[in-house]
């Protein structure tokens, strides 16, 4: 056990002025703190007052991240006290701004920075990390950060923010989480010229050297932390994201949140929307604006969900259309990747999205291309003309990249549109006086619960069925009252309960399918998983002190 000033410098141990007098004396920190004793609730109040005093979301982000560096328990106590308020600060949309200014906001290193020049030595670098038990890693190479593109080493803000939500929303213990940046350079000329840039100052290394780095990283991580260590890939460029997922998914315990997590939350929204449209998913025609990893991930999970309804895979694929930067994806068109070719149909080539919407007449329109304003007034009005209750998801992040706003959607569909977005939007009051609360299809509904479930049962590999199961659980947690208010997702205040239910369901299916590795199987799975959840309450550091009977303590001469 640390003592003295080291206790106050360790965010895992530090309680600030919540240390009792006895703790201060026993830990040799008496006199290193003001002669004041504050409870955790008073400390939360102090942080909230400072938070409210700030006017910039970036400054609020820095305030909270500084707190995480000082007092971990208090940081998570603050986050969980009002998750709906703080999630947009520690994650989307503010984390995107924080990544763009990461050099300016950088205070204290958090996570592991591994570069292309460290090949052959990654195992040694992992030994430098102070924690010997790591259950979850979020790793990025910074090439496709949200909808902002290549931010290189500045992308470290994403794994840090993601893992904060692993704990705040899922209860995964923070000391068992490790954010990792794989720095192979950046093609962002602005960053290469930025005097505050904290990463390697050269163009991205690609090809065999890049693949060798990834292979070594995966082998080193599992050698150090075990084959059941969860490795989440985050914000890799499209080409690498699919390739690496296919390469590693059956060898390691891994998933890609941009492909599979986004798919799960989008399908959850669609399943909830079906309770409004009163039909089946396989009755719908889906059009995607975008054909990257998010779109393809959603499309593949929709196919799986339609198959579960009894439709063949071929029939399900016929109901899905995609538009990329070159237009409608059709058979015979040039520049189609194998993943896109999967959803190419016999149709003439078309480029304009408004014309495509008029021609295809989709019942579901999903935007994941990070093109702000792509869903024009004409498109929204056409969707309302084709459908009694059009389903329109503007899932691109951050807010500036959203295909349309909630207000535009409700206005141009005359309040009939069923809406979900990737970033938060304020409630909208219709001319009728009804107030609608746009559903935010945030991946944070998915990955914390998935992580908790996977870690709790020691799941060996994470298949797409896990994400369809997760989508079903999320949709089931949406009440009729939520739907009447325009919400396609459970209120964020319930996200910890939702994550727990996801974890329990994943673990149950893992034990049923013999894919779990934590044995013996707990008799009460929910109670077992609850026992694994992180507590934000302070630990007591007073030594266990007691006395013996006086006769037993007599000194014999």
UniProtKB/Swiss-Prot annotation:
The N-terminus is blocked. Its EC number is 1.1.1.40. The record marks 258 as: Important for activity. Transmembrane segments: none annotated. Pfam families: malic, Malic_M. This is NADP-dependent malic enzyme. NADP(+) binds at residues 144, 238, 291-294, 325, 397, 443.
């Amino acid at each position: 056990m640390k003592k003295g000033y080291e206790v106050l410098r360790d965010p895992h141990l530090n309680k600030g002025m919540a240390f009792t007098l006895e703790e201060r004396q026993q830990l040799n920190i008496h006199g290193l703190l003001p002669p004041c004793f504050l409870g955790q609730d008073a400390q939360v109040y102090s942080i909230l007052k400072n938070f409210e005093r700030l006017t910039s979301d970036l400054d609020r982000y820095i305030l909270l991240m500084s707190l995480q560096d000082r007092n971990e328990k208090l940081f998570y106590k603050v986050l969980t006290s009002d998750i709906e308020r703080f999630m947009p600060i520690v994650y989307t949309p503010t984390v995107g701004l924080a990544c763009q200014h990461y050099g300016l906001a950088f205070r204290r290193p958090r996570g592991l920075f591994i570069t292309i020049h460290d090949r052959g030595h990654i195992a040694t670098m992992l030994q430098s990390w102070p924690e010997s038990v790591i259950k979850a890693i979020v790793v990025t190479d910074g090439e496709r950060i949200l909808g902002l593109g290549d931010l290189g080493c500045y992308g470290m803000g994403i794994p840090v923010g993601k893992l904060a939500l692993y704990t705040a929303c899922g209860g995964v213990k923070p000391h068992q989480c490790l954010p990792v940046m794989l720095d192979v350079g950046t093609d962002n000329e602005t960053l290469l010229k930025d005097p505050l840039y904290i990463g390697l100052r050269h163009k991205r290394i690609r090809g065999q050297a890049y693949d060798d780095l990834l292979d070594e990283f995966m082998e080193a991580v599992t050698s150090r932390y075990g084959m059941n260590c969860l490795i989440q890939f985050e914000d890799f460029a499209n080409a690498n994201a699919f390739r690496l997922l296919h390469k590693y998914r059956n060898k390691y315990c891994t998933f890609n949140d941009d492909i599979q997590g986004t798919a799960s939350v989008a399908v959850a929204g669609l399943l909830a929307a079906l309770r409004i449209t009163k039909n089946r998913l396989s009755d719908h025609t889906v059009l995607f604006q975008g054909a990257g990893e998010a779109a393809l991930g959603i499309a593949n999970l929709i196919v799986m969900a339609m198959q579960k309804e009894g439709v063949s895979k071929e029939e399900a694929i016929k109901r899905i259309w995609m538009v990329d930067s070159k237009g409608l994806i059709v058979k015979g068109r040039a520049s189609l990747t194998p993943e896109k070719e999967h959803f190419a149909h016999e149709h003439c080539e078309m480029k304009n999205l408004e014309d495509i919407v008029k021609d295809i007449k989709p019942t579901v329109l999903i935007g994941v291309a990070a093109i702000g304003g792509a869903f024009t007034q004409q498109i929204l009005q056409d969707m309302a003309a084709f459908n009694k209750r059009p389903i329109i998801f503007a899932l691109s992040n951050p807010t500036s990249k959203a295909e349309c706003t909630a207000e535009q959607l409700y206005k141009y569909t005359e309040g009939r549109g069923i809406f979900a977005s990737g970033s938060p939007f304020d409630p909208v009051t219709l001319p009728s006086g009804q107030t609608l609360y746009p559903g935010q299809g945030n991946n944070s509904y998915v990955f914390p619960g998935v992580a908790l479930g996977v870690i709790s049962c020691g799941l060996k590999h994470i298949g797409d069925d896990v994400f369809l199961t997760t989508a079903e659980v999320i949709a089931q947690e949406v009440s009729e009252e939520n739907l009447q208010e325009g919400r396609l997702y459970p209120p964020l205040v319930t996200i910890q309960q939702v994550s727990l239910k996801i974890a329990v369901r994943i673990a149950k299916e893992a034990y049923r399918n013999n894919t779990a590795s934590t044995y013996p199987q707990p008799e009460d799975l929910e109670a077992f998983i609850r026992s694994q959840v992180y507590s934000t309450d302070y630990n007591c550091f007073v030594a266990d002190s007691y006395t013996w009977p006086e006769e037993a303590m007599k000194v014999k001469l």
